[in-house]
Amino acid sequence: AHPQLLSVAASINGPDFAPFNEALFIKDPGIGAAVAWHQDGVTHWDSADFEEDIHGFNFMAQVYGSTAVNGVWVLPGTHKLGKLNINELVAESGSERLKGAVPIICNPGDVVICNRQLLHGSFPNCGFEPRVTVNFGFHKRSSVLGVMGGGIHSDAQVFDEITVARRSRAIGYAIDARAQRFPDETPYDYAPLSEAGVVYRWNASARLDLKDYNLDDLSI
């Protein structure tokens, strides 16, 4: 709920942006496996309204930083090209070390913005440093509202206003939790909640209310 990060989400996806999901990616030395090259997103590749941001983006906060050995690699610009034939790219490169791919290199505490359509993957962590990434993503509301979900991060379902609002309460709770932790900071004003006059307070009841909130992940 960092106000600067949520402001970035609004600048990319509009002030009525919707949450996607949250996850930890842990890649320990020697046992962190490879993740094959892939593009995220399943629902909008053939949409008449397809554009480079239609499947949203992820913030990737690096706890210990990331290196070329333990980090994610990306192929710049591929988020604009639609669904790619990855097998052809591997064949053209002669290996899974794709031509033009670059690693995401970060210091501890750095936050990366990664478009979900960008071709990305990672190699086995053969180094000596762990990578822990706190991943949290956001969508344009128009990308999820009334859309049948992809059924990957949550059960396939149509994301109606009620579902989107229910999933978005996590943002409200997070904003209040941060305000309690940093009382001198100006909290982010999340338009869908403030315009509806809805206020969420972070307390013991909130923990119970958030139980299994991820079952409503807006998976597109």
Show the residue positions of the predicted features.
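Non-heme Fe(II)/2-oxoglutarate
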Residues: 118-119, 123-220
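Non-heme Fe(II) oxygenase catalytic core, chiefly the N-lobe of the double-stranded beta-helix
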Residues: 1-108, 121-130, 136-150, 215-220
